[in-house]
């Protein structure tokens, strides 16, 4: 007796059917428990928080010799005061200059030739004005300095431009001054020392100065005497600029602007920066030095002196790095922030990242890191520096970010500063490099461990999950997992990310649509079959994908070797679980239900869930039902496991058997072993676990369509148990129990059992108490009573006088639409109830009411007269 809804699905075998798939609503959530084929839920694998902050935790597959250290010593001597780029080892050939500019003036004073003046860029004028304004601000806060040259002691600290020395028909450029050879030698004798690019002083030797010179074209011969000009850096083109003179003349406005900015920087340096550096050199109490560092950072920022173009950078670095040895975490963070702002590179970048990493290992320093906005500086390193050149620096930078990402106090800052986008971009760079070059970057696997661990901490946020979908992060993670499938740590972290993401419908749908993920997950299961921490998460992900998407069930099952992979995994962990089982006499009886599942049990729980979910697909379910290996392991699980041993595993295995028993196919192992399965279910029926009882009754609902199983039910008094369950006042249990009784009443010989156990009254009570809120259950009750009353001659003799009158009253009122649907439901639930009332309950109830009315007399019997 199927409802119109059931008939539309075109499947007449089971006694109840799943509802038509549609967008999930609150009404559909209620009806899910009624489906003959049901998905199975489970908990996400637990990931304990690491006790210590390290690059690689205790569960890492890396050996101590095969990974970068988390502990190291770091001192001022670790840093380099010179942070210039390495000099190329290739000697370039001199360029033959053929300038197209007019011949040079004959006067030596005009060797810095004058070119036609193009219109001055207004933006450049503004920059010069700003530089001048900065000078006036600095001067107003300190004693006003002379407008021209600095005192001799200070001028020695001024960084000059590169030296250009030419021999014969050449010229010499020293500290921005072009000199002839003879004048240059005199200049060197009177100025033997100069400040080098790295901030140190060096002595210029004549032979070094004139080494490797080249001759100049005629227009540069007889160069003018620059002694009349002030020594200002870059006031004339350097040797590296000469090659550009063929096509481009240097505008005089640019030279004037550069002169002004350099002059302003010198004044600002001496009036604002030098006094702070002197304060730092005193190394008084930590609070004073920290305050001075903060003041220094603000001053450098105000003077626009941050970055790798700043000329006093080496002197500044030397002063700052010296303070690292003080050993104060708060001071070191302030030093690190300034050093990073100076755009250091190579060894210094690595060491400053190590310094922050070392501090961030202590959770107590999280507040210091947050107060100093160190996160922003670290993200800037990842955003702006070159990945290949600075892989090790990136590693420790990411290690620090990973540590603080575990602190919820940083979550909003990380999201707002673009951490998610930056980290996914890093993964993308690594993926693209492998695709382009076919090789792995050194230490890229170590870096990916830190990146993926950080993302794992962040994906609990709905904002982060939304960003993942917007920037297509899931395919990038799958690609990284595929390329680094030999790195268990990377794969485990990405599996943890997917475990969290697929617990949400939108993310689960996005991953399910990436068709390559199924083969990837199967490969990981085959590769790491005995690595429980990875396998359990991969299987959990597959369970999520197949629970919410029928297309995912189909795609997974079509992957080569998918069922065999699941079977092999089932066998592996079944054996591990058997070996870990204690003898019955040694098992503790107290608090057994509270014992968490073992590692092997946890994998089996997730695995049976996948089997139950994919069995819903009509193309997969019959295949699984006919697989002796799958069915055999499920039955073995019920044989040696009790609800007290592992409740979730037993219930999942039973739910899987229920879904497989739905398919009435010739080669079904379930059908061949139906009586043995019925025996195994008896121990669940007599348990005190309501979930276990419910799953067992559901299986009996499918199996009881077979005549032999019905005989087994009656012989073992299972029908009495089903009638007793009608008193449970639990809608799902009553629904399933009523389904078994309905199947029993198909056999005319077994209809009488309803009267023997008071079944009719229990069915009527169930209709009265639960019918108005569950029209599907009310429909099943009416179907059962319809089957029972097939050969009715008199309603009262069939149902009993009291139950007949109750049925007439209930059916009449339940068939009144206004009375039946006058419930306080939200619109969604109201439509749901109306649908099932109209399509399922009303047709059957109307026929039953008509039958009772036809065979019932309303004449009351006359009382027996008394004599």
Curated annotation (Swiss-Prot):
Stretches with biased composition (Polar residues) = 18-28, 40-50, 60-69
Q: Please list the coiled coil stretches.
A: none
Q: In which tissues is it expressed?
A: Expressed at higher level in testis.
* UniProt entry tagged with the keyword Repeat: yes
GO term, biological process aspect, one: sperm axoneme assembly
**Positions of region (Disordered):** 1-115, 214-252
User: Biased composition, Low complexity: where in the chain?
Assistant: 70-81, 234-243
Cross-referenced Gene3D superfamilies: Leucine-rich Repeat Variant (1.25.10.10)
Does the record bear Lipid metabolism in its keywords?
Answer: no
SMART domains xrefs: ARM
State the ARM repeat positions.
262-301, 304-344, 363-403, 408-449, 462-503, 506-547, 551-589, 591-616, 619-662, 664-705, 707-746, 748-790
Q: List the keywords (alphabetical).
A: Differentiation, Disease variant, Repeat, Spermatogenesis
Described function? Required for sperm flagellum axoneme organization and function. Involved in axonemal central pair complex assembly and/or stability.
Q: Which disease is it linked to?
A: Spermatogenic failure 38: An autosomal recessive infertility disorder characterized by asthenoteratozoospermia. Spermatozoa exhibit multiple morphologic abnormalities including short, absent, coiled, bent, or irregular-caliber flagella.
Q: What is this protein called?
A: Armadillo repeat-containing protein 2
Q: Which organism is it from?
A: Homo sapiens
